[in-house]
């Protein structure tokens, strides 16, 4: 393992092997993804009122809800998580179809300038591989790793390959 990273934002649903590729090609160990930071939610089931209150609070503080419309604290939350896990970088999945996340990208880029943890922004279309393909995503990562991290791949044969028709 060369690098430790967490991901934030909606990853492409059409490339579940992204963490495997990161590790095998570049030595980036994906410690955790955004959805793992929800914690264990315990809802009081004493009566209907407490159940509804618990469900409402869970929705109010759920990761995707905070990610899209959360308060001022949310945009810095992943920096705290990256620090807890001793990460070298945060990989921000910049889903081009998510207006909430697009609005935060500028704020997050400004925050990254003040941090030692690197920020890799990877654009994707969560549900449509024709818009931004797996090859496009690989190229974004490759460009970042070469230019920002000044790194060489562990396995150059994995930099690009034809998987356009792959599921």
Kindly give the residue locations of the regions a language model identified.
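Redox- and metal-dependent alpha/beta enzyme cores, enriched for Fe-S-associated oxidoreductases
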Residues: 11-79
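Peripheral docking tails and interdomain loops at the edges
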Residues: 106-167
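Acidic-and-aromatic substrate-binding clefts and catalytic sites of carbohydrate-active enzymes
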Residues: 13, 67-72, 98-102, 128-131
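Structural motif
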Residues: 7-12, 94-95
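Domain-level signal for soluble alpha/beta catalytic cores
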Residues: 4-7, 27-44, 50, 139, ...
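C-terminal hydrophobic structural anchor segments
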Residues: 72-116, 120
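Hard-cation-handling environments
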Residues: 1-3, 21
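Extended, charge-rich low-complexity interaction segments
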Residues: 58-79, 83-86, 148-167
């Amino acid at each position: 393992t060369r690098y430790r990273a967490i991901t934030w934002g909606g990853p492409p649903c059409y490339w579940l092997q992204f963490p495997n590729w990161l590790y095998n090609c570049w030595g980036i160990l994906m410690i955790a993804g955004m959805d793992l930071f929800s914690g264990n939610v315990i809802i009081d089931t004493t009566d209907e009122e407490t159940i509804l209150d618990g469900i409402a609070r869970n929705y109010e503080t759920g990761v995707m809800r905070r990610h899209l419309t959360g308060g001022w604290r949310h945009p810095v939350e992943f920096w705290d998580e990256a620090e807890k896990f001793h990460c070298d970088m945060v990989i921000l999945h910049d889903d081009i179809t998510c207006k909430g996340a697009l609005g935060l990208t500028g704020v997050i880029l400004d925050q990254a300038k003040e941090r030692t943890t690197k920020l890799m922004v990877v654009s994707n279309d969560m549900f449509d591989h024709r818009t931004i393909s797996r090859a496009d995503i690989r190229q974004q990562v490759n460009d970042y790793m070469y230019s920002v991290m000044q790194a060489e791949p562990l396995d150059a044969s994995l930099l690009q390959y034809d998987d356009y028709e792959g599921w």
